[in-house]
């Protein structure tokens, strides 16, 4: 069996090189993931995305841009987004004895964060972000840590649904 699936590749710098352009033209390339090393300014990011789409309109432009410590673009008009754990912490904060208010506020905040994250990326030409993280935080992984909403799967799934 010979399965050929498209790859998402990366580039080194702020602009496309001749080698990058050749790789992006390859039919087995499905998209590109951007990192902090590809960021200089909002104008530069917008130009880079336009250059990528000029090569092939069907290429997906992705980024791991979650908020908190995993936010690739942090200046020049990008909002500093909270770590997902902050949204999870809102879940249990019922104000003035109103049961369920914390859940509602957490879901509303997750929806607002998701909208803002997507709008800012889309305005520059980025197609999607690899967020949210759906890992459960049992306190055993510093890699996951505050990137996770919570340790409760129900809470994680509802907040993730709200964010998306």
How would you name each of these model-derived features?
Residues 1-16:
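Boundary/entry segment of secreted carbohydrate-active catalytic domains
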Residues 5, 18, 129-132:
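N-proximal short alpha-helices
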Residues 15-29, 33:
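N-terminal glycine-rich anion-binding loops that anchor highly charged ligand groups
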Residues 28-156:
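Enzymes and membrane/adaptor proteins characterized by extended Gly/Ser/Thr/Asp/Glu-rich
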Residues 158-162:
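Metal-dependent enolase-superfamily TIM-barrel catalytic cores that perform enediolate-based chemistry
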């Amino acid at each position: 069996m010979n399965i050929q699936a498209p790859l998402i590749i990366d580039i080194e710098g702020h602009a496309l090189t001749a080698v990058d352009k050749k790789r992006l033209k390859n039919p087995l390339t499905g998209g590109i993931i951007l990192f902090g090393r590809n960021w200089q300014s909002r104008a530069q990011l917008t130009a880079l995305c336009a250059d990528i789409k000029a090569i092939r309109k069907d290429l997906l432009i992705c980024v791991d841009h979650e908020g908190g410590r995993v936010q690739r673009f942090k200046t020049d008009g990008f909002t500093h987004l909270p770590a997902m754990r902050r949204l999870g912490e809102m879940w249990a904060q019922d104000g003035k004895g109103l049961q369920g208010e914390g859940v509602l506020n957490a879901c509303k905040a997750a929806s607002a964060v998701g909208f803002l994250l997507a709008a800012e990326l889309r305005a520059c030409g980025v197609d999607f972000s690899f967020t949210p993280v759906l890992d459960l935080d049992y306190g055993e992984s510093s890699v996951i840590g505050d990137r996770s909403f919570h340790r409760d799967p129900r809470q994680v799934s509802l907040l993730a649904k709200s964010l998306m």
